[in-house]
Amino acid sequence: MLQPLGSKALILWDKPLKELVGDIVRKSLQNAGIAFLEVDFEGEATLAERKRVGDIVVGSSTNAAANQCDISVAIGGGKVLDVGKGVAVDHKMRIVTVPTIASNDSPTSAASVWYDENHCFQGFECWPFNPDLVLVDSRVIVNAPVRAFVAGMGDALSTWVEMEASMQTRTKNLSGGTPTLAAAALAKLAFDILLEYGIDAKRDVENHTLTPAVEKVIEANTLLSGLGFESGSLATAHAIGNELSNVAACQAAGMMHGEKVAFGIAAQLCLDDSVSAEYRNMLFEFMIEVGLPVTFEDLNMTPLDPVVLRKIADNVAVPGSLCHNHPFEVTSQSLYDAMMAADALGKALK
C-alpha cells in the first residue's frame, strides 16, 4: 500500500508499541521494498516534538545517518498521529496514519492539536491536505484498552451534538468553509451508530471480541466522526474539553480527549435551552452506561474548587471561542452554571 506513495518511510511510534508490533511492521516494509527510519515518540504532541522529529528526518540532529523520507507513517494514538502529520507537512512528505486505538477522530483529519510540555492545550492547526492513507486493524483496536475505545465514543458523539447546534448559525468549519449537508449526514450517522451499538461494542471490547458492533463503532469513532467534525463545525463541548486539559486534576487522572469532551457534551446539553429534557437525559444515560464522564467526580475534580471551575468558564468564554458558535449568547456565568447543572444531573441519574 505504501509503494505508490514513496520509497522511504519515517516510522513514528512509542517504545511500548514498537516492542509489540515492531517486527511485523519492519518485515512488511522490507517485503515491500520500502526503506525506513524509526523514531520514538516522546510522549506529547508539542511543537518541540514536531521539530525534534523533523530534525531527525532531515539529518540535522545527532542521527546524521537519516536521509530525507518521503512518507510519514505515524503509528499509535492521536498525539503520535498529530505529530506525524505536522512533520509530513513541514518536510513535504505523504501522510499515513495507523491508529492502534479508536480513541478520537484524528486519523482521517487534516488537523493537529498541540499541547505544551505540561500537557496543557495550546490550540489546533489545519493542514492543506488529509492523510493519503489511513490503516486500521480492527483486531489491534479490540485488544487495546477499553477505556480508549469508550473515549473515542465521547469524541464521536460530540460531532453531531455540536454540529446540530452550530449549523444554526452557519458557523465556518476549521478550514474556513461552510458545513455541508453531507457532513451533517456523516455526523448523524456516527451518532446513531453509537446509540445503537455502543453499549454492546464496549462489552465486546472488554472481552477482546471482534464483532459487527465493534466494527461499526470503530468506523463511527474514526472515519465518520473525523469527516464529520472536520467538514462541519464545533461548539461548547470541545471548548470545555480542551480547557479541561489544563486542569491539574484531569491531568493527574490521565483523562483522555474524548472523556473531557464527553463532559463538555453534558455541559452543552444543559446550556442549550432548545434541548428537550428527554433528549438530554437520554444522552446522559447513554454516557453513564458506557462509562463516559458526566460529573466532576468522573473527572477527578472532587472536592470541587469553585475557583478552578470559574477559571475554566472564563477561559472558555473568551472572544473567538468555539462556545460562541451557538445561536444564543454564551457567557462565563452561563458556562459555569451549565457545568454545575451537568454535574448535578449526572449524579441524579447515576
Where are these regions (language model features)?
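Short glycine/serine/threonine-rich phosphate/pyrophosphate-binding segments
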Residues: 19-21, 79-86, 104-108, 233, ...
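C-terminal charged capping/lid subdomain of soluble metabolic enzymes
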Residues: 274-350
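A short, small-residue-rich loop immediately preceding and capping a beta-strand
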Residues: 60-100
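A glycine/threonine-rich phosphate-anchoring loop and its flanking beta-alpha core
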Residues: 89-182
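Acidic, glycine-rich active-site loops and adjacent beta-strand->loop/helix elements
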Residues: 79, 100-104, 140, 266, ...
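Active-site segments that bind and position negatively charged phosphate/pyrophosphate groups
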Residues: 174-292
